[in-house]
UniProtKB/Swiss-Prot annotation:
UniProt GO BP: protein quality control for misfolded or incompletely synthesized proteins; rescue of stalled ribosome
Catalytic activity from the UniProt record: an N-acyl-L-alpha-aminoacyl-tRNA + H2O = an N-acyl-L-amino acid + a tRNA + H(+)
GO molecular function, one term: peptidyl-tRNA hydrolase activity
Keyword tRNA-binding annotated: yes
Gene name as annotated: pth
Protein name in the entry: Peptidyl-tRNA hydrolase
One GO CC term on file: cytoplasm
Amino acid sequence: MLGLRLIVGLGNPGSEYIKTRHNAGFRFVDGLVQREGQCWALESKLFAYVARVFIAGQWVWLLRPVTFMNLSGKSICAGLNFWKIKPEQMLVAHDELDFPPGAVRLKFDGGHGGQNGLRDITKLLGHGRFHRLRVGIGHPGHKDRVVSWVLGCPTCDENIAIDAALERASVVLPLAVAGDFDGAMKKLHTVV
């Protein structure tokens, strides 16, 4: 299988959203940029901030859309086309209501599961054949509270759990970049 060449973090732009649960994907790519000592650069034709990091002997593009979550596909499709990267070589990091804070899973292919960023990406691509990093943020318990939940800030304990999950995901990233998704999934999904 082809290795990763593009890692996208989903979230909403703007200072009022920085620390919200919905921005778990931004937190992941921001952590990679910081860890690798890189900086984001605004690329207006891609509707995103972009950076490059060197992982497992490969240069990998990072993309952080400046569009709102439900319009993420525009930026992602622009990046895929500009860099001539196949969707199968892309990892999209996003918040996941179905997992508690601290849980994180890799997945390939599938639907959007109600996640509006994924909904837009799959609509514009015409399929869901790309990798996802599903970062648990928990569920408020009732569907009527979902919007305020995802746009709310995690508690201190939830933040600690989410940060630990993002760290575990970054540890397996070299395997995914090298194309060993089974190995990355096994390592990430195995609780020690």
